[in-house]
Amino acid sequence: MSHRPERVAEAIKKEVADLIRNDIKDPRIGFVTITGVEVTRDLSFAKIFISVMGSDAHRQETLSILQKSAGYMRSEIGRRIKLRHAPELIFKLDTSLDHGTRIAEILHEINSQEAKPTHE
């Protein structure tokens, strides 16, 4: 079995991060972290999972801006990685960090409740 999709996914992750940091000049884009990239076996689609700091409205706005600039990023990726056909980019919000933060908060609450001495 080939590891090419995994290598392409890593290259796409690196290039998209560089494009967001240096080429996309929209001030509405906040602090964006690319948490992962999944590429189909035939390299026709690439799901790019992002985490965005801020409110839900800000996250949706950032996602919309990135999706609108996906065509430009696709052409740049095709040029930089030298693929015959650059995959179509699909941006998705990664909420796993939010879930992890919420679980940590719940565990902290439980620990602080158990640490309180009970008066019996």
Swiss-Prot record:
Q: Which Pfam families match?
A: RBFA (PF02033)
Job description of the protein: One of several proteins that assist in the late maturation steps of the functional core of the 30S ribosomal subunit. Associates with free 30S ribosomal subunits (but not with 30S subunits that are part of 70S ribosomes or polysomes). Required for efficient processing of 16S rRNA. May interact with the 5'-terminal helix region of 16S rRNA.
Give an example GO molecular function.
ribosomal small subunit binding
| Annotated GO biological process | maturation of SSU-rRNA
Family annotation (NCBIfam families) = rbfA
- In its UniProt entry, the species of origin is given as Desulforamulus reducens (strain ATCC BAA-1160 / DSM 100696 / MI-1)
Protein name per its UniProtKB record: Ribosome-binding factor A
* Family to which this protein belongs: Belongs to the RbfA family.
